[in-house]
UniProtKB/Swiss-Prot annotation:
Subcellular location: Host mitochondrion outer membrane
Transmembrane segments: 17-34
Cofactor field: Mn(2+)
Domain notes: The N-terminus is important for both membrane association and mitochondrial localization. It may also contain a RNA methyltransferase (MTase-GTase) capping domain. The C-terminus contains the RNA-dependent RNA polymerase domain and a structurally disordered region at the very end.
Domain of life according to the entry: Viruses
Keywords: Host membrane, Host mitochondrion, Host mitochondrion outer membrane, Membrane, Nucleotidyltransferase, RNA-directed RNA polymerase, Transferase, Transmembrane, Transmembrane helix
Family per similarity comment: Belongs to the nodaviridae RNA polymerase family.
Pfam family, one: Noda_Vmethyltr
Organism for this UniProt entry: Black beetle virus (BBV)
Residue numbers annotated as active site: 692
Protein name: RNA-directed RNA polymerase
Other known facts: The viral bipartite genome is composed of RNA1 and RNA2.
Length: 998
């Protein structure tokens, strides 16, 4: 009834009612949408896009409804470990290279920390895994195959020094993934990027790397103000076809990124770490202006439009100062001035006014004021084009953890790049910290005062008796015979200088120095006796004993010093055959430093005392006293130190005595294994020994370590493996059962073959040719090693001096292999070439394809400085800083001790931190036997009495007065006073207790 009243006479049907409702709802919705859309066209309270309200509303609506946030949490500086990375090897750009390496590590670690994967653009050969975009544009790119992968969904786009060459940043940003770049973005218009010079010309950076390449490139303004940038969004082919209708009406897909940058590297302030974080993806009309404000990445224009020929760059310092760097295009001269000062100076009317104002501001440097005036006048000059000789590559440097050095200082040169990346390091022998750390690690920390048990002492006594055999009344060599045997040029020169003084008691002093040789840990110490009279005195006995006793028939099966390479090879092969290849290699750890005074007294000294006539015993004991207890000083630096009781490497007793200790340890192990056997039978089972190298029967593999510990020694044992050969005296026997062919220990050789320690005045080509010629004599058939040597000889030969000139140098054979001086070379047979190659592959862990590639590379090389380095998987460096920071196990509880010792030697007046006299004695025997030495060692009647000493340990200085002639203490060789800091305290002074070490 009510409806009828409202609608009149017309009555609606049931069908018409829903239609009416729908019509009304639709109209309402349309009105709502129109009002909502019209609301997008509202006038904002800030600047807005042009066009009419309809287009403005249309653009705003599309952006608002299609925006898709992208959430990525990434902060790479959480993985920053150091701001001053170091490189142990100076390849000409060690600092900038270390920064690049650190940046790569930082990027890798930060990506891994958030669970992402890396997608790198043209990575270097060190980065060989993962997805990548790798095109061949530089020669170095050929090291990896061409690839054009698609980034994964969790990928981080990485570029290290490659963004300059990108045609447009969108190729990196379009994937809508974080982008991380290590880039060069200078804050000055010329100068040095750490150790690499650069200039800017025509808005292009000309960057020249010492020991590397030269690069010319523009720079993107990643570090400009403005934190948001836009990019296109990459789509697949399928998406592109599906979105084609949208594109036809002018819609495009756009991504927005937030850009960050930092400069974390203290040594390279012009290097920046740039990373972008994607924020949103939207659709928008490309024919309607957008109101989203972003900056557009562009190339930096360094040219000053107001001063043709000049570059100008402004930057803000950490102290919020706005500075300006100005300099002429292509020139290295540049100056930096505060922006407000330059603005003021630019408005002056005369150059004189500019000079006056600069001086008034406190700028009195002529170079500084001249550059400002030249910029003021806009003076242009024509830059000369001249070749530049850049800093050569430097050897890898062993950098002790306690060193205070700012730059590496080594006395060695490279004549090619390293063959393997984990090459040996050269010690900084000119740094006293190097000497100090070597003393601690090779003397103090390993000092041994172990006294063996009665059973072990009895075994050692039996060994000495069997070693001496029937000899009991030997005579030493005469002075004349000994002089003839000491035939090294340096020895002959010293002997001629003291010929008239023969018979005078020699000085009791060791002068030590670091051996200038490549290695993987703290360098070895050569403890030399500077007085040739002492060497003459000792050699009379050691030479006679070796000739008659050690080379006697009953010792020839195990005593190998004095044999030539062919004899050694034959003996080793015979021993291995006798044992059916069941043999082990033995290698002592720091035998020189660990030999105890007990071993020296009861093995080496006892053997000679019992072998020579009784009238010579006092003289033998005298020189053994000196060897064991002699004081020492650093030859280069002058500080004195406790050398310990170990074997002194500069003594003529070193090799024969070490060989005897080596043999005694094996004899002890054999006795453990066969306690009921006759000693004579066990003695005949001792394997080849030479110094601290040895071969033994595998039956004592377990007991020989026990035997070594009984004497306080440490020993490494390795069982013979036919796949890797048998190593003895740094020669690898490839198959001792079938052939005498040997090769140099390949990994050890490859690590140091590129280095020379010859005098730097000798041309590098001469030094290189001399060195590789020696290796070609001993290893003419060794694969890879001989190929490398032939390459060096081929490329350096044309520029090297003539054979006659090189032969006239006394140091010609300095770096020749030792065995070339021993009447022969090691045997090698052509039919064993394949076997040699397989052993080399196993020992170096370089697969056969890579070995063949290196050999082919050596044969094709045109320049010695071409890149040849094979990347090693692991580093064997120890006690140093390597390219990745501190080498494993280099910093431990010994660090405070090393620092204490270094500080003590830097300040000789302070107390020695080693209360036990360097660790040479902790038990029953007094350090350095001062009480016995105060009375003077026993002397033979026919020699002048040895001078008396009153030696007492005082810190790191041994004070004492002697009756022998020589330079008085406190006086230099010319009568002048020496450094008072090195003057020892008076005899009898008491050492001060140390609070640092016990």
């Amino acid at each position: 009834m009510t409806l009828k009243v409202i609608l009149g006479e017309h009555q609606i049907t049931r069908t018409e009612l829903p239609v009416g409702i729908a019509t009304v709802s639709g109209c309402g919705a349309v009105v709502y949408c129109i009002s909502k859309f019209w609301g997008y066209g509202a006038i904002a309270p800030y600047p807005q896009s042009g066009g009419n309200r309809v287009t403005r509303a249309l653009q705003r609506a599309v952006i608002d409804k299609t925006k898709t946030p992208i959430e990525t949490r990434f902060y790479p500086l959480d993985s920053l470990r150091t701001v001053t990375p170091k490189r142990a090897v100076d390849n000409g750009h060690a600092v900038s290279g270390a920064v690049r390496d650190a940046a790569r590590r930082l990027i890798d670690e930060s990506i891994t920390a958030v669970g992402g994967s890396k997608f790198e653009v043209n990575p270097n050969p060190n980065s060989s895994t993962g997805l990548r975009n790798h095109f061949h544009f530089a020669v170095g790119d050929l090291a990896q195959d061409f690839r054009n992968d698609t980034p994964a969904d969790d990928a981080f786009i990485v570029g290290v020094d490659v963004d300059y060459y990108v045609t447009e940043p969108d190729v990196l940003l379009e994937h809508m993934r974080p982008v991380v770049l290590h880039t060069f973005n200078p804050k000055k218009v010329s100068g040095f990027d750490a150790d690499s010079p650069f200039t800017i010309k025509n808005n292009l950076v000309e960057y020249k790397v010492s020991g590397g390449a030269a690069w010319v490139h523009p720079v993107w303004d990643w570090c400009e103000a403005g934190e948001f940038i836009a990019s296109r969004v990459r789509t697949s082919w399928k998406e592109w076809f599906l979105q084609l209708p949208l594109r036809m009406i002018g819609l495009e897909k756009v991504g927005y990124h937030k850009i960050h940058h930092c400069r974390p590297w203290t040594d390279c302030p012009d290097r920046a770490l740039v990373y972008t974080i994607p924020q949103y993806v939207i659709w928008r009309f490309n024919w309607i202006d957008t109101e989203l404000h972003v900056r557009k990445l562009k190339r930096i224009e360094y040219q000053d439009e107001t001063k043709p020929g000049w570059n100008r760059l402004e930057y803000v310092t950490d102290r919020n100062e706005l500075l300006v760097s100005i300099g002429r295009e292509g020139e290295h001269a540049q100056i930096t001035i505060e922006k407000e000062k330059l603005d003021m100076l630019s408005g002056l009317s005369a150059t004189q006014s500019v000079n006056v104002r600069l001086i008034g501001m406190g700028h009195k440097d002529p170079q500084y004021t001249s550059m400002i005036v030249q910029y003021y006048t806009g003076k242009k000059v024509v830059s000369p084009i001249s070749p530049t000789v850049y800093k050569p590559t430097m050897p890898r440097v062993h950098w002790p953890v306690t060193s205070d050095a700012d730059v590496p200082e080594v006395s060695a040169r490279q004549y090619t790049l390293p063959i393997v990346s984990d090459c040996m390091m050269m010690p900084m022998i000119k740094r006293w910290e190097t000497m100090s750390e070597s003393i601690e690690r090779r003397v103090t920390f390993v000092a041994n005062d172990k006294k063996p048990s009665d059973r072990i002492a009895k075994i050692a006594e039996t060994f000495v008796k069997l070693m001496n055999g029937p000899f009991k009344d030997l005579d030493p060599l005469s002075i004349e015979e000994t002089i003839e045997r000491l035939n090294k040029p340096s020895q002959q020169l010293q002997l001629r200088a003291v010929f008239e003084m023969i018979g005078v008691e020699p000085r009791q002093l060791i002068e030590s120095f670091n051996k200038n040789e490549p290695g993987m840990k703290s360098s070895r110490i050569i403890s030399g006796f500077p007085d040739i009279l002492f060497i003459l005195k000792v050699s009379r006995y050691t030479l006679a004993y070796s000739d008659i006793v050690l080379h006697a028939e009953h010792n020839e099966h195990w005593y190998y010093p004095g044999r030539n390479p062919t004899e050694i090879a034959d003996g080793v092969c015979e021993f291995v055959s006798e044992c059916d290849a069941e043999v082990i290699e033995t290698d002592f750890s720091n035998l020189d430093g660990r030999v105890s005074s007990w071993m020296q007294r009861n093995i080496a000294q006892k053997a000679m005392v019992q072998a020579f006539r009784p009238e010579y015993r006092d003289e033998i004991i005298s020189f053994m006293d000196t060897i064991i207890n002699c004081s020492a000083k650093a030859k280069r630096f002058g500080f004195r130190y406790e050398p310990g009781v170990g074997v002194k490497s500069g003594s003529s007793t070193t090799t024969p005595h070490n060989t005897q200790y080596n043999g005694c340890v094996e004899f002890t192990a054999l006795t453990f294994e066969h306690p009921d056997a006759e000693p004579e039978d066990l003695f005949r089972l001792i394997g080849p020994k030479c110094g601290d190298d040895g071969l033994s029967r595998a039956i004592i593999q377990k007991s020989i370590n026990r035997a070594a510990k009984c004497f306080g020694l440490e020993l490494k044992v390795e069982r013979y493996n036919p796949e890797i050969g048998l190593c003895f005296l740094s020669r690898v026997f490839v198959d001792p059962l079938a052939t005498t062919t040997t090769i140099q220990d390949p990994l050890r050789t490859l690590r140091k073959l590129h280095l020379t320690t010859r005098d730097p005045t000798i041309p590098l080509a001469d030094a290189a040719c001399d060195r590789v010629e020696g290796h070609l004599c001993t290893d003419a058939l060794t694969p890879l090693i001989s190929d490398y040597c032939k390459m060096v000889l081929r490329l350096y030969g044309p520029t090297a001096s003539t054979e006659q000139v090189r032969n006239q140098r006394r140091s010609r054979n300095k770096e020749k292999p030792y065995w070339l001086t021993c009447d022969g070379s090691w045997p090698q047979h052509p039919q064993d070439a394949h076997l040699m190659k397989q052993v080399l592959i196993k020992r170096t862990a370089i697969d056969e394809d890579q070995v063949d590639a290196l050999i082919g590379r050596f044969a094709a090389m045109k320049d010695v400085w071409e890149k040849i380095t094979h990347d090693s998987e692991e580093s064997a460096a120890a006690c140093t800083f390597d390219e990745d920071g501190v080498a494993p196990n280099s910093v431990d509880e010994s660090l405070p001790m090393l620092n204490d010792a270094k500080q003590t030697r830097a300040n000789p007046g302070t107390s020695r931190p080693h209360s036990n006299g360097g660790g040479s004695s902790h038990g029953n025997e007094l350090p350095r036997r001062t009480e016995q030495r105060a009375q003077g060692p026993r002397q033979p009647a026919r020699l002048p009495k040895q001078g008396k000493t009153n030696g007492k340990s005082d810190g790191n200085i041994t004070a004492g007065e002697t009756q022998r002639g020589g330079i008085p203490r406190g006086k230099g060789p010319r009568g002048g006073k020496t450094n008072t800091r090195r003057t020892p305290p008076k005899a009898g002074a008491q050492p001060q207790p140390s609070n640092n070490r016990k």
